[in-house]
From Swiss-Prot:
Binding site for a divalent metal cation: 8-9, 40, 92
Species this chain originates from: Agrobacterium fabrum (strain C58 / ATCC 33970)
Assigned keywords, A-Z: Cytoplasm, Hydrolase, Metal-binding, Nucleotide-binding
Keyword Iron-sulfur: no
Name of the protein this chain belongs to: 5'-nucleotidase SurE
Entry's Gene Ontology cellular component terms: cytoplasm
């Protein structure tokens, strides 16, 4: 089995090294094409206004001056000798759940793999920002290999990929696995204004306390209860329950 790895934290990120160790428990044919620099929060963007620069780090290990989407495209279309059997994106430092999935470059790596016709999974490791960015990578590294082996046997429809989030706990305290839906978060988003040396304003986007209802059956609820969350996500964003209402409002009758 040929596996392509990418991430959004960059080619030197600790989570990518963790993902490589996970992947090597599944196959000895593991390739990496990851961003040269941190691309967090760039979602499913791709580079069109400048060239992509590819650097070989070592055998089967490449850095690209581009986004996670660029990396998967280059990996599948240019770098690998043949199409991979699996794309793994991560392991992200921090959970990617609820509304976060639309911002996430980690999720985008799995989205692009899916668009390219390859089974794809995104992996993220939750941690507490109040603990000085101490990420419990051992949780993902301990449980991901067996979980991925099982998930490889799932018959996923075209356009669907899996989003895996690992809880912020010690491996011995992990409480199991839940198959979940997306939750809903209040971002607590603020805009912080500062001034540079010339007195000109600049801004930082900041997130405060992230509140939510943590409804049972959601990714947030699973992680809050020490469980691994596995969420099937699909590329088709159409809200089919609203199509007829929109069509009727426009005088078309029932939508096709």
């Amino acid at each position: 089995m040929r596996i392509l790895l990418t991430n959004d934290d960059g080619v030197h990120a600790e989570g990518l090294a963790v993902l490589e160790r996970i992947a090597r428990t599944l196959s000895d044919d593991v390739w990496i094409v990851a961003p040269e620099t941190d691309q967090s929060g760039l979602a499913h963007s791709l580079t069109l206004s400048e060239p992509l620069r590819l650097r070989k780090v070592s055998d089967k290990h490449f850095a690209l001056r581009g986004t996670p989407t660029d990396c998967v495209i280059m990996g599948i279309r240019e770098v690998l000798p043949e199409k991979p059997d699996l794309v793994l994106s991560g392991v992200n430092a921090g959970a990617n759940m609820a509304d976060d999935v639309t911002y996430s470059g980690t999720i985008a790596g799995a989205i692009e793999g899916t668009l390219q016709g390859v089974r794809s999974f995104a992996l993220s490791q939750a941690f507490s920002h109040g603990e000085g960015r101490v990420v419990p990578w051992e949780v993902a590294e301990t449980y991901a290999p067996d979980l991925l082996r099982k998930l490889m046997n799932v018959d996923l429809p075209d356009g669907t990929f899996l989003n895996l989030n690992f809880p912020n706990c010690a491996p011995k305290d992990m409480q199991g696995v839940s198959v979940t839906g997306q939750g809903k978060l209040d971002f607590g988003l603020t805009v912080e204004e500062r001034q540079d040396g010339r007195g000109l304003p600049y801004y930082w986007l900041r997130f405060g306390e992230r509140l939510g209802t943590f409804r049972e059956g959601t990714d947030i609820h699973a992680l809050k209860h020490g469980k691994i969350s596995v969420t099937p996500l699909k590329l088709d964003l159409t809200d089919y329950t609203v199509k007829d209402r929109v069509a009727q409002a426009l005088g078309f009758g029932v939508a096709d």
